[in-house]
């Protein structure tokens, strides 16, 4: 089994700026993810064009099991991890979840190898 991914599409709430969300992601949110075993990479993409108020947050995990643990932490941590709860509350003030996809890597290769 390959790496596992969580891809979430977030939309800024009216009156919120992308700069605030980007700043929170690069500091507090990233800091919290570093404490969770199995989280390999975080990528935040800003949509352009008609959907420029949307962001795509991709989280890469070592395995499906690491993803399951991350979901458990995400659901339970706000009850006992004050810093995590504060960051999630800020995140949810800035934007709302529009869509979510999860799955494992099927194919990953450089285009020069084709």
Regions found by a protein language model. Give the residues of each.
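Active-site-flanking beta-strand signature of metal-NTP-handling nucleotidyl enzymes
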Residues: 2-11
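A short beta-turn/loop motif at secondary-structure boundaries
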Residues: 45-52
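An amphipathic, aromatic/His-enriched active-site/gating alpha helix that lines ligand/cofactor pockets
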Residues: 27-41, 60-102, 114
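Long, acidic serine/threonine- and proline-rich intrinsically disordered regions
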Residues: 104-108
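Conserved "boundary/linchpin" sites in short secondary-structure elements
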Residues: 109-113
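Glycine-rich acetyl-CoA-binding "A-motif" of GNAT/NAT acetyltransferases
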Residues: 4, 53-54
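Short, surface-exposed ligand-recognition loops at beta-strand->loop->(often short) alpha-helix junctions
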Residues: 11-25
């Amino acid at each position: 089994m390959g790496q596992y991914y969580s891809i979430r599409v977030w939309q800024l709430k009216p009156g919120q700026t992308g700069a605030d969300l980007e700043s929170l992601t690069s500091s507090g949110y990233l800091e919290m993810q570093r404490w969770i075993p199995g989280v390999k990479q975080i990528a935040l993409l800003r949509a352009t064009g008609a959907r420029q108020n949307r962001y795509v947050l991709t989280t890469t995990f070592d395995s499906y099991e690491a993803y399951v643990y991350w979901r458990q932490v995400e659901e339970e941590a706000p009850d006992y991890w004050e810093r995590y709860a504060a960051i999630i509350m800020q995140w949810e003030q800035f934007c709302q979840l529009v869509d979510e996809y999860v799955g494992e890597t099927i194919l990953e290769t450089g285009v020069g190898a084709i």
